[in-house]
Amino acid sequence: MSMESKLLDSRIKTRSVKNSEKWLGYLLGPAGALLLNAVLATYLNVYYTDVLNLTGLWGGMFLMIFPIASKIIDAITNVIMGYIIDHTKTKQGKARPWLLLSAPLLTISGILLFTVPMENEKVMVWWVMISYNLFYSFSYTIYNMSHNLMVPLSTRNTKERGGLSVFNQIATIMITGILVAMIFPMVIMPMIGVDRSKWISLMSILSLLALPLTLLEYYFTKERVTEETIGEEKKEIPFSTQLKIVFTDKYTLIIFVYFLIFTFGTTFKNLGLVYYCNYVLGSYNDGITQTLVSVIGGIPMGIGIFAVWPIAKKIGKRNATMYGFVLYALGGVICSIAPRNMAVVLIGQFIKNIGGLPCSYVFMALFADVLDHIEWKSGIRCDGTAMSIYNIIAVALVGICTGLFNMMLAHSGYIAPSIDSLGKTIAAAQPQSVLNAITFSFVGMEVITAILLVFLLRFLNVEKTIELKQEEIFRIRKEEAEKEGKIYKDPETVAREESEKEEIRTREIKLEELKDKCDKNGWNYEEKKAEFIKSEEAKKKAEREKQLNNEKKAKAKEGVKKAKVRAKYDLLPAEKKKAIKEKEMKKQKDLEAFWEKEKKEGTAYRNFVKAKLEMKDIKNESL
């Protein structure tokens, strides 16, 4: 069936986002694939070690090598899939067609992951490798990359886009925070134990559920942005050039090493969670230990967003993240003191997760600063290239960590559970070497990575001059626009004008829809139009008043704050005032010297990149 077929058309016909799109396309639709992936991320390795008993296969080397090799393939397919989506042009958009394809692939590959033949070892090995790569390297890669693009491609209206993003986030939190973190360890896992037939039944149900829900996401989403850009052609910077720019910048390298170390520790912790709760802190699938660790340890993540940004604004994003990792390490040390004591571990996990708040909420903002720095330095935005590397690190490390974790289990003597004659799961008493390996994975590894990150972040000074660099970017853009005889507008003005245009367009669309509704129901359009306009104006007036009140409150609050600081300063002795003034002057002088050095290096590099690109253009024209 061609993508031009009306049967494949989106059920969303409006230019503005409707409730059906939010609830069905962005909340309920993604739930199937997200649930399947979240369960696999937590329990697939448990299935391999405890149900299929693959820990000792090939002397423990199989579960070490195959995840690493598979994730290398996964990393490659991520890059290829990104390229394919960018070059897909159909009536249904560029991402939605791949959502449609992923629906049956997720179901088939999800079932194949668990229906592993046990009779022949060679067949079993090949089945595990092929099914794993079919799901992660193809099915889920196709789904995830197209799914992640749906919000950006849905609309240009920032309010509507923000609303869709919230619904998407609710779907993720609902799945991972409630179903997988609470329901599964409390109810489902104690029921299925290590009974292979029950695992197959459960995962087949989840895989089958992904099919209709992913189709729901396909039919109740719409790529409005793609529809607007059909036919446009843009001059592209060579990927090799962007790659050189990214890998020759110190801040980019620091942020990638940061992400690599952080992901390494986090992945080990996530892999060790189930085993730690089953053998060290609690008993096998006791239904409560894992839930307590996940929920109590995760409470700060829910409330922390209200505290993190005020702190980050006051002391800086880098500093907030760095000090957070000090708490992160402290929490891990507390857990290590008594890893079998529930109260001690929960306290340690709570402190640890408070420390982890800045890196969870602030990292992408720091990453954005680095991307702005790259643009200032080279004159080129390298967002896509940088994000590709970011994704490759994330994907590859999951495989590497899984392989290393399984090697630790195998070489420390891990004993898989068994089923007795009554079908009850019997957990083996693990040797101390296994308990030590599991405890190190869940608790100890992140203590080491947190300390390394505190040291590494000391060198990430991108915030120091980022505002000056952003001003420089705008100045350069203005000069380039004037050379071409164009009028330059700053980003705030452009954003405001685009927002105003979008509001007018949205209003016109709503009026058209209202007219159709009036014609259909025999209503008086002029009366309904007057009511609509009156309602919209009342909403705008209320929003303006609210904004003005908020601005007044913020201004008054800032005034009180400054007055308190000034009063406190006035009470200081003259010597102290002098010392503070000298310190501020030195800080300003150091900043100016730092900026001048950076500015000189940045200008030279930007001119170098520009000259290289011009040479390539001349060479291409001559060909």
Say what each PLM segment does.
Residues M1-S2, R477-L623:
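Long, low-complexity, intrinsically disordered cytosolic termini of multi-pass membrane proteins
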Residues S2-D490, G522, K564-R566, L591-L623:
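Membrane-embedded alpha-helical bundles of multi-pass transporters/translocases
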